Amino acid sequence: MPGSWPPRTVIRKSSGLRTLESALYRNGLGPVAGVDEVGRGACAGPLVVAACVLGPNRLESLAALDDSKKLGEKERERLFPLIRRYALAYHVVFIPSHEVDRRGVHVANIEGMRRAVAGLSVRPGYVLSDGFRVPGLSVPSLPVIGGDAAAACIAAASVLAKVSRDRLMVEMEEQHPGYGFAEHKGYITPAHTAALTRHGPCVEHRYSYVNVRRAAEATGVRWASDRVGVRWSTESAAETEEVRRALEAFEVEWVTAPVEHEDAACAKMGSG
């Protein structure tokens, strides 16, 4: 029976993206899943977490895998369908802004990672996470500093999360014009700050973020002060449902209830 930790092995980052995963497979700890998030630093839009399991053999089709932040948009879009085609399993979880507000971004991120791993159709023998430990997983795991540039499965998860979130933010621009979501994807940029100053925040902004609250106060936008602790209004729930329907083609799990509960009411749209 595989142990919880592999024997001590020297892994050099320069050895390639598959070196760490290969060492785990050789020691009987596969399949190996990578998990990563996108949107942690954004002040609008969801936090998106993806988990991905790649097979033990290197695929030439995925040779360009790297940290999604280092890849251009065209390259990410090219890799996105290839990862979904060749991965043994993948699962993407969207955590909406009101849930990030309610739980806090770090706790929401950890819970999203747990759900992404739990949603895989193939049970991993080991999980590699990008940067920090994910407590509460049912299988052994290891945080990898700079993981999306050091392990192919994390890099693949990073691309899945990034492309899925970017596509949603383009959809969000159509629902909330004037903010430039299609361009800055909800991150804090001069253009986004200027839009907040002009219009005040919309329901997709994260009111637990200081810049969003200040913009709301400066523009007189009414916002529920208890949003940071509970979910938004029924109007927000309706908008969330509209966005959820737009996500059906992405094969994701849309978290529509507190993420700390495993029996949360989720609209599950496949796991790849």
Curated annotation (Swiss-Prot):
Location(s) in or outside the cell: Cytoplasm
Domain of life: Bacteria
RNase H type-2 domain boundaries: 30-221
Keyword ATP-binding: no
Biological process, per Gene Ontology: DNA replication, removal of RNA primer; mismatch repair
Catalytic activity: Endonucleolytic cleavage to 5'-phosphomonoester
Protein name per UniProt: Ribonuclease HII
Organism per entry: Mycolicibacterium smegmatis (strain ATCC 700084 / mc(2)155)
